[in-house]
Amino acid sequence: MIPGQYQIQPGDIELNAGRRTHSLTVANSGDRPIQVGSHFHFFETNDALTFDRAASRGMRLNIPAGTAVRFEPGQSREVELVDLAGLREVYGFAGRVMGALD
């Protein structure tokens, strides 16, 4: 093995396998672009984003880690969300949960 070398199994890796997903239509009602990262608790995003906020509680964007989705002013788009995993506790972000989700 060469230092730093990766040994990866052949084939595709399925992200978030077996987790519940939900699609939502999201619109930016503000006058500035809003960018949401892959692991941000979607329920707590900028208030200028209009969508069914209650349906997004305990979920994040179903996109690869380290990436983001940008919502331009006046733009509406459909996004897919995926359940948060692990302990399902949320702290920080906009401070709207600060504890267990379930």
UniProtKB/Swiss-Prot annotation:
Covalent S-S links between cysteines: none
Similarity field: Belongs to the urease beta subunit family.
Pathway(s) per entry: Nitrogen metabolism; urea degradation; CO(2) and NH(3) from urea (urease route): step 1/1
Molecular function per GO: urease activity
Record-listed E.C. numbers: 3.5.1.5
One Pfam match: Urease_beta
Species in which this protein is naturally found: Pseudomonas syringae pv. tomato (strain ATCC BAA-871 / DC3000)
HAMAP family given in the database record: Urease_beta
Protein's name according to its UniProt entry: Urease subunit beta
First-listed, main subcellular location of the protein, grouped into a coarse class: cytoplasm
Hydrolase listed as a keyword: yes
Any Gene Ontology biological process: urea catabolic process
Keyword Acetylation in annotation: no
Alphabetical keyword list: Cytoplasm, Hydrolase
